[in-house]
Amino acid sequence: YGIIGFHLDRGSIKKDAVKLQEEIASLNNNRVKFWNENAADKEVMLSKMEEIKTILDNGKVKLLMHSIAFGSTTNFFNPTPVRQRQMDMTQHVMAHCLIYWTQTLLENNLLIAGSRILGLTSEGSYKAMEGYGPVGVAKASLEAVVRQIGWELGSKGITANTIQAGITPTRALTKISKDWEDWVERTKKRNPMKRVTTP
């Protein structure tokens, strides 16, 4: 399968993203295209649609994966109360933009029977935790978005689901809490295989 993706990386992290893109290209005969742009931005999405269609060359999107880990990691109240624009941004980026991507791909006849839509969720969708207020709300919203997509598009043979892979030691995890390493260790203890998901 070819892979089309977006990432939003700056500075030294950008080099890691380029390296990963090269690794992926070496595995799938160079059938890969990534843009270092904000996938949650409507203008970016619309501006890439014609290029996506050209890359697909009359093909269709087999899998739409929503894996955007960018939101406000704070509490609702103390010590740093969340602001409305932070909540709105987190909701849009981590949940609502999947609706607009799905709509746009449908409008461009790029999703068909057999297409799959996946979103990555977390236990924060049903469990309160330090510094996870806005993201937890967004994860619960993402699950509701995916349920509704599945209900509306199921008759077209398009399925939608979320995956809760558990604690995964990524750069995004380190931004959520200074105690992220403790989270990883606790997760290993309760996992029968004594491990966590690897990125």
What spans do the regions from the language model cover?
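Catalytic loop of short-chain dehydrogenase/reductase
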Residues: A69-S155, I167-P169
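Short-chain dehydrogenase/reductase
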Residues: Y1-H66, F70-R85, T174-K175
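A conserved structural motif in NAD(P)-dependent oxidoreductases
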Residues: N191-P199
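A glycine/serine/threonine-rich, flexible loop-to-helix segment
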Residues: A17, P134, S155, I167-N191
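Hydrophobic pocket-lining residues within nucleotide cofactor-binding pockets
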Residues: A39, I167-T168, V196
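Hydrophobic structural elements of the Rossmann-like NAD(P)H-binding subdomain
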Residues: M65, L118, A160-I163, L173
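Nucleotide-sugar donor-binding loop of glycosyltransferases
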Residues: H7, Q164, P169
